[in-house]
Amino acid sequence: QVVETAPRLPDGSPFPTLYYLTCPRAASAIGTLEGGGLMAEMTKRLETDPELAAAYRAAHADYVAKRDAIDVLDGFPSAGGMPDRVKCLHALVGHALAAGPGVNPFGDEALALLPEWWRGGPCVPVAGKGAGKGADESADAAADPAQSNPH
């Protein structure tokens, strides 16, 4: 459901989104959360909850360290608004899926609010797989994304 991308485009320009969601159903559900005002509410909580703010700064440090291990983007912050605000839940959920539970508090929170998008089988058609056993196996394997590393 998430892929790790190169921090630079082929022309050398920065591409700060390290973790990119590949499932259109998940991306759509996240867009619904964004449209509902969740990001503004999360950003306000950063101002009043020092422990949450510290955890979010740690998520930012984790994100930047993983990106910089591939290619350093001097002067470019991490994605999603980290560490001072919440700007893109897609980036935060991608980070949460790739890093695992407990690393990105807002990514974890948004992920917990999503419907079970993986229950319907693969997010995109799989070549050679019909609606039969192959799709069921894919759905079973993805039934609990917290139990597997999705990238």
Residue ranges of model-derived segments:
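Preference for intrinsically disordered or flexible, low-complexity segments
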Residues: 1-136, 140, 144-145, 149-151
